[in-house]
Amino acid sequence: MSILDKVVAAVTPPESDDARREAREKARSAARPGDWLSSILQHHEMIESAFAEVRAATDPQQRIAAHKRLALILTGHSIAEEAVIYPALARADEKGHSTKAYTEQSAAKAQLGLLGNLPPMSQDYLDKLEHIRGAVLHHVYEEEGDWFVDLRQKLGEDEQALLTERYLEEFNRYMGDDVPSAAGIVPRPRGASIGNAASPTAR
């Protein structure tokens, strides 16, 4: 196991499914229709569903295609957060959270790239996928539970509008013509288990 593997595995989410659901509901309550936070919540749900699609694939071609869709939405979302939301966190006197968020997302993207080098139907692939998913779920929990809710409360309406415009601009710039493809990743129903979306089964 590489150093990055160990880092990702070490942050497998300690929080429960109930805690993650509560964090998401808290963030939904703070969000406004069409704003940057509601867009991020939608993208988080799409990422969770994309992980589940990768895990559920039954042949190499299906898994490779699902992996590409996961990488697409995860990278587009990460780029938009890193360009717009994390700098806003830093400006709101949350430099520690901003730095931690950058570090976690960089590790997840690096690991997802390495995952693509493994045989897609192997147990090594599934183990690494689960480590990455666990790290991403924990990262999402941090953002939804406090970081982004606090940011939403600290900023004025003009700043909120600018964040919304810039976040979607960066996301759509990366996704390009693939935005409809990503939209085809159906978010999990509200109330569905977040933590067990892609957990491995005995083989």
Could you describe each region identified by the protein language model?
Residues 1-203:
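Small-residue-biased structural context
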